[in-house]
UniProtKB/Swiss-Prot annotation:
Annotated GO biological process: phenylalanyl-tRNA aminoacylation
Family under the similarity heading: Belongs to the class-II aminoacyl-tRNA synthetase family. Phe-tRNA synthetase alpha subunit type 1 subfamily.
Binding sites annotated in the UniProt record for Mg(2+): 254
Keyword Ribonucleoprotein in annotation: no
Gene3D superfamilies: Bira Bifunctional Protein, Domain 2 (3.30.930.10)
Protein name, entry field: Phenylalanine--tRNA ligase alpha subunit
InterPro entries xref list: aa-tRNA-synth_II, aa-tRNA-synth_II/BPL/LPL, Phe-tRNA-synth_IIc_asu, Phe-tRNA_ligase_II_N, Phe_tRNA_ligase_alpha1_bac, Phenylalanyl-tRNA_Synthase, tRNA-bd_arm
Pfam family, one: Phe_tRNA-synt_N
């Protein structure tokens, strides 16, 4: 067998490769010449029938032919890929007059935004943020707050009880008791958290958020309490509102009051907003604070109620439905 057939095979392969116009055709040529059943492998199989004097030269020629054909395939592949890229750039031109694609940008939930604003305000007044457990015992949730055994808030139809002693807290006031036990006056703290009550309607949900504040010091009085709350509410709503203090009753404060709010454009429509009062002396005695030296005041605000008033929302349940159409309004 002479070397001529191998040389002719390389020439044929080169001609086929140069005429190929796509990657599929190029792959077919590779298989045709370099595949297991390709032309060059057939020549390799025929080496055994070749005379010994020409066999080494023929083997070397076949290997060189493989390299040459492989190089031609790679070069043609690169050319075809470049053509494909150019064609894509020509056909897929960008119309700069089209509107851009807007990406969805996350934002704070309205409840989270309200909490953030409240923290900023009270931090400027020197309040520290503290936290407490959501699973409470009856002492911190009721007894230490001067709430008697017969109080309706202890009933099973109002409160989520685990057993006779443990419950889901109905307010964050237990955090204040722990603060007064673990700290010495002056005390100036606020707490935020989830609380639980067995209510579900347009204005109540089984879980909601509450913020409570507490100051215990030697020069604490009711007028200072009123000033702090008025300053906060005027700062929060950033609009014309009318506030009124009215007397109320809470077992843990004496005297007690509630604040109602009315927007000036909604004359006559008072809305209950928060409760407050001077810390009851019995509570200070429970935590070994000398009532001859110190007094305190506390206040509690429903965060959902505050947010509803801010954004004119009339149903508290929408906060917990994960309705994107509703939540997108607060971006």
């Amino acid at each position: 067998m002479s070397l001529d057939p191998v040389k002719k095979l390389v020439i044929l392969a080169k001609s086929n490769i140069m005429q190929s116009n796509n990657m599929d055709a190029l792959e077919a040529i590779r298989i045709k010449f370099l595949g297991k059943k390709g032309y060059l492998n057939q020549h390799i199989k025929n080496l055994n029938d070749t005379s010994l004097d020409i066999k080494p030269k023929l083997g070397a020629a076949i290997n060189q032919a493989k390299e040459d054909i492989y190089t031609l395939l790679i070069e043609r592949k690169n050319i075809l890929q470049s053509k494909n890229i150019k064609n894509t750039l020509i056909t897929d031109t960008l119309d700069v007059t089209l509107p851009g694609r807007l990406s969805d940008i996350g934002t704070h939930h309205p409840i989270t935004s309200t909490i953030k604003r409240m923290k900023i305000f009270f931090n400027t007044l020197g309040f520290s943020v503290i936290h407490g457990p959501e699973i409470e015992d009856d002492y911190f949730n009721f007894d230490a707050l001067n709430i008697p055994k017969y109080h309706p808030s202890r009933d099973e139809h109002d409160t989520f009880w685990f057993d006779e002693k443990r419950l889901l807290r109905t307010h964050t006031s237990g955090v204040q008791i722990r603060a007064m036990i673990n700290k010495t006056p002056p005390i100036r703290i606020i707490s935020f958290g989830r609380v639980y009550r067995k209510d579900y309607d347009q204005h109540h949900t089984p879980m909601f958020h509450q913020m409570e504040g507490l100051i215990v010091d030697s020069n604490v009085n009711f007028s200072y309490l009123k000033k702090i709350l008025y300053d906060f509410l005027y700062n929060f709503f950033e609009t014309d509102i009318i506030l009124r203090f009215r007397p109320s009753y809470f077992p843990f404060t004496e005297p007690s009051a509630e604040i109602d709010v009315m927007k000036k454009q909604e004359t006559g429509n008072w809305l209950e907003l928060l409760g407050c009062g001077m810390v009851h002396p019995k509570i200070l005695h429970h935590v070994d604070i000398d009532t001859e030296k110190f007094s305190g005041f506390a206040f509690g605000i429903g965060i959902e109620r505050l947010t509803m008033l801010q954004y004119n929302i009339d149903d508290i349940r929408v906060f917990f439905k994960n309705d994107l159409q509703f939540l997108d309004q607060f971006k």
